[in-house]
């Protein structure tokens, strides 16, 4: 592993409250490459303090703010969608994305792209599809063997988000044994983080 990557990893593992501790000196010409690494790995908010006195600081700050805004918008989308299904007696489980945010030092730093919900019961899944259609969720064409995709656009902002409604945990060719998940097993491991 090269020294630049080691510096990047050190930036990620150094406590936020002491960004100067044990970091090697960073030469000015290394900052663009460190920025590119953090951007590629969606970790810009974590390295922001180290760029405070550089010309890249405002760009990283702006991208970090955008990530955090996106987090709150997807959080709102998640709450809206789960509440809608719950109101109709449909139990669903949040997968990946926002459900992992609690594992981060700052939950808002978790980069999010869409909402993944899993519905174990086939009849509930079919009902959910009808409910979503009636409430403005539009089909989004995507070839997939384990979920259907919907696009929802908030009227006030015009911002749209994708929902992947899973009827299997993973694709049949990814890891088939993961799919026969029982409702009892899901209930035993259900968490209410962020919802």
What are these regions (language model features)?
Residues 1-113, 119-187, 192:
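Conserved NTP-donor binding/palm subdomain of two-metal-ion nucleotidyltransferases/polymerases, i.e.
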Residues 195:
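Cytosolic catalytic cores of cyclic-nucleotide second-messenger enzymes
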């Amino acid at each position: 592993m090269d020294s630049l990557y080691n510096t990047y990893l050190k930036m990620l593992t150094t406590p936020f409250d002491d960004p100067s501790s044990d970091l090697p000196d960073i030469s000015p010409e290394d900052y663009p490459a460190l920025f590119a690494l953090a951007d590629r790995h969606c970790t810009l908010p974590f390295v922001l303090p180290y760029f405070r006195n550089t010309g890249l600081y405002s760009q990283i700050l702006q991208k970090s703010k955008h990530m955090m805004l996106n987090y709150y918008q997807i959080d709102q989308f998640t709450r809206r969608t789960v509440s809608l299904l719950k109101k109709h007696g449909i139990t669903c489980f949040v997968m990946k994305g926002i459900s992992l945010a609690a594992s981060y030092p700052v939950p808002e730093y978790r980069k999010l792209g869409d909402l993944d919900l899993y519905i174990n019961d086939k009849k509930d899944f079919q009902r959910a599809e009808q409910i979503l259609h009636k409430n403005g969720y539009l089909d989004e064409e995507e070839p997939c063997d384990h979920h259907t995709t919907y696009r929802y656009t908030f009227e006030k902002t015009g911002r749209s988000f994708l929902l992947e409604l899973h009827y299997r945990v993973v694709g049949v060719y990814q890891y088939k044994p993961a799919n026969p998940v029982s409702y009892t097993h899901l209930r035993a491991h259900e968490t209410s983080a962020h919802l």
